[in-house]
Amino acid sequence: MSAISVLSHDDFVAQISSKYTDVIGAKLGGKIISFSDEWFAEANNLIQPGLPIRQVGKFTPAGAWYDGWETRRHNPEPADWVIIKLGVASATIIGTEIDTAFFNGNHAPAISVEGTFVADDKDLDSAKWEEIIPKTECGPSQRHFFARDALTEAPYTHVRLKQYPDGGIARFRLYGKPTAVFPADLNTEIDLAHVSSGGIAVAFSDQHFGAVDNLLIPGRGKDMGDGWETKRSREPGHVDWVIVKLGAPGYVDRVIVDTANFMGNYPQSITVHAINSPDADPAHDDPNWKLVVDRTKTGPHKIHEYIRADAASGSPDADETQKVLTSANDEVFTHAKLTIIPDGGVKRFRVFGRRASA
C-alpha cells in the first residue's frame, strides 16, 4: 500500500493539483452513479465546480440547506458511500481533496476512497474495490489534502467515497492521470491538449476569475464561469499566459482558440508557441519556445482556428481561420503556450496534431 501524506494547501497545489487532473469533476463529465443516502443534501454537489457556499437561514423540507452531500443521522452501517464514474475513460490516482466547508457538528468524522475498473456500470454490483486512500480522520469546516507517494498501479473507471459513519462533505476532488486511448494510426489527428488525451495546464500567469484547466475540457461550456479569465491588467506591455503539457509528443497541424461567452472581456490578441522539452516543464520565458501562431487579433464569442500552411481547409465550425507558421509542420513538440494580450478570457484551447510515436 502506498504511503499517504497530509499536505498543506500550498504543497498540494505544488505537488498534486498543478500536475494532475481532477478526474471526477462534473465539468469533465464525472457522474454520480449511486449512493447509500442523501437525505439532507444531494451527492451530486460533491463534484460541482467552484467553492461551496453557505446560505444561513435557508431550509428545505429535509432541513437546513447545504452545498454538499449530507446523509441522515444514526447510520446503522459502518459507513455511507457514493459511487462516481470518472469523467475520462479511466485514470490512475495520486491524491484527493475532501472539503467539509460549513459542515460543523455534522461533518464526516473520517473518509476513505476506493477504486474499481469495470467495462459497464451494470458490472458494479460484482466489482472488486481496491483501497486508494485508507480511512483517514477529517475535521469540521475545512479543506483536507491527502496524497499518495505514487500513482496507483492500475487505472480505475469508478471510485467510491466512504464517510464513517455518516455526516456531510461539501466537495470531493480526486486527482490523477487520465489513461488516454489513442488511435493505433499515428497519422490520425487528435487534440493533444485535451484532458482525455492527458493534456494538463502546468503553469500560468493568473487565473483570477476562471481556472486554466477549463481550457482543456470537453465542449464549449455554458457561460464565462467555465473558461480561463485573468484579472484586468494596468501595466503597459502586460500579457497573461498558460503552458500546457501535451498528452503525447506530436506534430501540430491545427490550433483553436475559442472565446465563447467572452463578449466584452476577450483578449485583444493572442500568440501561440510550442517547445520540445521532454525532460522537464519549460519556463514561460525559455528562449527555445518556437512561434506557432503569430500575434493575431481575436473577437468576441468566436472559434478562432489556425491551420498549417499546406492544409486545404480548416474546421467547418470555425468562425475565423488563419495560417500557422510552417515551423510547426515537421517538428515534434511536448508543450504549447497560449499568450493572451494584454489579458481577458478564453473558453477553450485546442492543439490538434499527430502523435510522434506509439
Q: Can you annotate each of these PLM segments?
A:
Residues 247-249, 260-269, 279-289, 300:
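Beta-sheet repeat architectures centered on beta-propellers
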Residues 1-77, 94, 101-117, 123-125, ...:
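Juxtadomain low-complexity/linker regions and immediately adjacent membrane-anchoring helices
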